[in-house]
Amino acid sequence: LPAAVVRSVMKTLDRLQWRVTKKAEDAQRRELGLPRATSPAPRRITASGALEIQAYEQLCFPGLADEWKEWERQRPFVGTLTMELMTDADEQVASWIAAGTPPICFGFGSTAVKSPTDTVAMISAACAQLGERALICSGWSDFSDVTHPDHVNVVGPVNYATVFPSCRAVVHHSGAGTTAAGLRAGVPTLSLWSTGDQRIWATQVKRLKVGTARPFTATNRDTLIEDLRLILSPEYVARAREIATQMTKPAESIAKTADLLETFALQRRSA
């Protein structure tokens, strides 16, 4: 699409999202002693000359850093930010993984599936056909009452930073953070996207040749088997390991971000 059209669409989306969040934002600004906002946050950020930290990997969007060269100080790339927080399920998951062959991890994050029962049945059947184990991380969907066979383990939130590297592959909704965790883990990815922003990251997974992607609504038992066979092939496994070596380390991303924020704050204070 022409750049002018893209900008117009994004401005419209920003305003629509602002209408959804405006009430909460106004309340927060009152608590901080700030006046009510009169425009969407992206417009205010740009107009004020604020620091626009790019918290994702440059390799996902080659050429963008060069395109933004004149704004390099305002739009620095730091890599993906993650807190790598431990969860209550981590110990049990680690024990289950160690008790058998490395599983395929399925995570849906903020995407709520319409039928948890059908989804678990589809995953169970596909993995049984391939002779694989499945670790299903429920995210915002409730899988608590769904029965499943022995080769499947259903859990709540887990620490992707420790779980993903222990798996054969990861299958997820293609959220920005989950995609980055998969790339850092060095295992192949199957992106089953649902929304426009998820499709952006799914496209990068395919472009980097670390996996494949399709809409979640177009996924069934047969397509899942086909896609898993593809990403478990040696070339995708090798490529995923290669890309992992090019990712920023979590500690480096956090340190760089903190330094940038401190420097920017000091500059604004002394201006």
PLM features: residue spans?
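A donor-sugar binding/catalytic signature common to diverse glycosyltransferases
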Residues: 155-203
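C-terminal amphipathic helix plus adjacent low-complexity
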Residues: 221-271
